[in-house]
């Protein structure tokens, strides 16, 4: 069963970041992120498949998510990822959340992530997350 393609509104309103059937990527800065977005479009991804975020846009939300994490979440992989993402955001990283409902889409994302030296690429499954690079 494939999860639905998320919007920025979905992400903003979600209490936790768990975008099933999506890949979260961070790049050195907003300019590199923009170049990676163009490269993904060139491989066949549609505009609605790609949610791009600037560091300025992502940092406050990540700070809030880390701050609001419950004590139990502090020991899970979810909070480890949030802290990693926050660290990258505070260093000026640009972000993407890309809809990837199948392995072929994921491979195209990984190829672009490697070409643009992504800091991270994490695929979200229903019950687990997968570091892709």
What residues fall within each predicted segment?
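Positively charged, small/polar-rich N-terminal and surface patches that mediate targeting and assembly
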Residues: 1-133
């Amino acid at each position: 069963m494939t999860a639905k393609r998320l919007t920025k509104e979905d992400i903003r309103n979600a209490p936790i970041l768990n975008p099933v059937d999506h890949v979260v990527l961070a790049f050195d800065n907003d300019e590199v992120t923009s170049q990676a977005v163009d490269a993904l479009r060139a491989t066949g991804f549609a505009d609605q498949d790609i949610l791009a975020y600037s560091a300025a846009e992502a940092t406050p939300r990540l700070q809030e998510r880390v701050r609001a994490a419950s004590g139990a979440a502090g020991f899970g992989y979810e909070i480890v990822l949030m802290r990693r993402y926050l660290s990258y955001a505070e260093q000026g990283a640009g972000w993407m959340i890309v809809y990837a409902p199948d392995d072929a889409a994921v491979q195209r994302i990984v190829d672009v992530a490697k070409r643009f030296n992504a800091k991270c690429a994490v695929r979200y499954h229903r019950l687990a997350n997968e570091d892709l690079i």
